[in-house]
Amino acid sequence: MAKIKARDLRGKKKEELLKQLDDLKVELSQLRVAKVTGGAASKLSKIRVVRKSIARVLTVINQTQKENLRKFYKGKKYKPLDLRPKKTRAMRRRLNKHEENLKTKKQQRKERLYPLRKYAVKA
């Protein structure tokens, strides 16, 4: 089997990807048997290509799965931890914009009664 490109895999459905994954795993086991029995050098060098292909297929499966989960949870109140933005612990606990801008009644009254003075500079 030739080297598989990730862009070719992205258009396929999940069932097709799983079928291809099984085929690659079967091929890898056959190549490993050939390695033990003393197979040709071309088969030995093919083991690396097949392993990388398996990794590519799994990567595409996982990425599409995560993408679908992101679409599903978009706009929902709660999201799984791995879909939330990765921030530091302190940043997660910080007040949000709305909470930062809230003012007490006393502070609102003070600002209303004593507005900021504006000065005109005489040239």
From Swiss-Prot:
Q: Which domain of life is it from?
A: Eukaryota
Q: Which Gene3D superfamilies match?
A: 1.10.287.310, 6.10.250.3450
What are the UniProt keywords, alphabetically?
Acetylation, Cytoplasm, Diamond-Blackfan anemia, Disease variant, Isopeptide bond, Phosphoprotein, Ribonucleoprotein, Ribosomal protein, Ubl conjugation
Q: Which residues carry this modification: Phosphoserine?
A: 29
Q: Which InterPro entries match?
A: Ribosomal_uL29, Ribosomal_uL29_CS, Ribosomal_uL29_euk, Ribosomal_uL29_sf
Note the position of the cross-link Glycyl lysine isopeptide (Lys-Gly) (interchain with G-Cter in SUMO2). Answer: 25
Pfam families (alphabetical)? Ribosomal_L29
Which Gene Ontology terms cover its molecular function?
mRNA binding; RNA binding; structural constituent of ribosome
Q: Where is the composition biased (Basic residues)?
A: 86-96
| Effect caused by changing residue 77 to N | In DBA19; uncertain significance
Where is the protein situated, by its record's location annotation? Cytoplasm
**Biological process annotations from GO:** cytoplasmic translation; maturation of LSU-rRNA from tricistronic rRNA transcript (SSU-rRNA, 5.8S rRNA, LSU-rRNA); translation
Q: Where are the residues of the annotated region Disordered? A: 86-123
What GO cellular component is one of the record's annotations?
Answer: cytosol
User: Where are residues bearing N6-acetyllysine located in the sequence?
Assistant: 19, 43
The family note in this entry says: Belongs to the universal ribosomal protein uL29 family.
Q: Which disease is it linked to?
A: Diamond-Blackfan anemia 19: A form of Diamond-Blackfan anemia, a congenital non-regenerative hypoplastic anemia that usually presents early in infancy. Diamond-Blackfan anemia is characterized by a moderate to severe macrocytic anemia, erythroblastopenia, and an increased risk of malignancy. 30 to 40% of Diamond-Blackfan anemia patients present with short stature and congenital anomalies, the most frequent being craniofacial (Pierre-Robin syndrome and cleft palate), thumb and urogenital anomalies. DBA19 inheritance is autosomal dominant.
Subunit details for this protein? Component of the large ribosomal subunit.
Which function does this protein serve?
Answer: Component of the large ribosomal subunit. The ribosome is a large ribonucleoprotein complex responsible for the synthesis of proteins in the cell.
* Full protein name: Large ribosomal subunit protein uL29
